[in-house]
Amino acid sequence: LIIALGTNILCVKYNKLWLVNYIATAISAIVSLFMVGSMTSLSMIILFTLYTLIPFAKLKKNILITTFIIFILFQFFVVFNGRGLENNDLARYLVEDVLHKDLTFTHRTYLWDAALKIIPKSPIWGYGLVEGEWYKAHMSSIAMGPHNFILAVLLNGGIILLIFYSIICGYSINSIRPYFKDTEAKNLIFSTICLWIMALMEMYPYTIMLYPLAIMYNYQNIKAKQ
C-alpha cells in the first residue's frame, strides 16, 4: 500500500487525474489497516499522506532525515537487542508506563530473539528461502518468520545478501541524490523509508522491498520524461 501511494503521488506530475487515484488509495489503505488493527502500517500510511501535504521543502527534508534516523536506531537498539529490551528499565518505562504498550511488541521480541540465536550458526550464507515449517522447527512454535526484514535477509542469505541489498540501496540513493530538492523525489524517498519502518515489524517479499529502489534508481529517466 505504501509503495502504491508513493507511485501514485509520483504520477500526479504526469496527469492530475492520478490525484483522484491517490486519494482513493489513501482512504482505502487507512480504512482497511484500521479494520485489521495493523497500527505500524496504519501510522506510516497516515504519516506519508500528511508528509505529501507539507509545502515547506526544509521541513520535509528534516522530517525525512529524522524518520530515517529513527529507523536506524530502532533496528540497532531495539530489534538487534531481541528480548534484552525487556530487561531495560528505561525501555520498560517508556513503552509500558508512558505509551501503555506491550514491551514485546505483540511477541515480536520473541521472534527477533529466536532469529538472533540462529543467525550466528550460518552468518555468511544464511539458510536460503525456507518455508514456514522450518521457522517453527528451528526458531519458535509461534514463528512464521522473524517479523523483521533485515533479520529475514540475514536468515535467507546471511551477510552476503545483506551486503548485496545494501549495495542496491546505495546505487538507488546515489542516483536520486542530485534531485533531492524536488518535491517528488522527497516523497519517493520518504515512502521508501516508511516501507523500511513498516518492515521493522513485518516481512515483505523481496519484490516489494526492491520496487521503490528501482523507481529511485530510474528517477532521472522519469524526470527527463516529465
Where on the chain are the PLM-derived regions?
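Membrane-interface micro-motifs in multi-pass membrane enzymes
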Residues: 1-2, 38, 146, 154-158, ...
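Alpha-helical transmembrane segments of multi-pass inner-membrane proteins
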Residues: 1-55
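Hydrophobic transmembrane alpha-helices and their immediate junctions
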Residues: 16-21, 54, 60-63, 156-196
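Short, aromatic-rich membrane-interface segments at the entry and exit
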Residues: 18-21, 40-44, 60-66, 204-211
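Lipid-exposed faces of alpha-helical membrane segments in multi-pass integral membrane proteins
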Residues: 24-31, 43-51, 69-73, 160-170, ...
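A membrane-periplasm/extracellular boundary helix in multi-pass inner-membrane enzymes
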Residues: 27, 33-36, 53-98, 116-121
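Long extracytoplasmic/lumenal interhelical loops at the membrane interface
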Residues: 96-157, 178
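Transmembrane alpha-helices of multi-pass inner-membrane enzymes
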Residues: 187-226
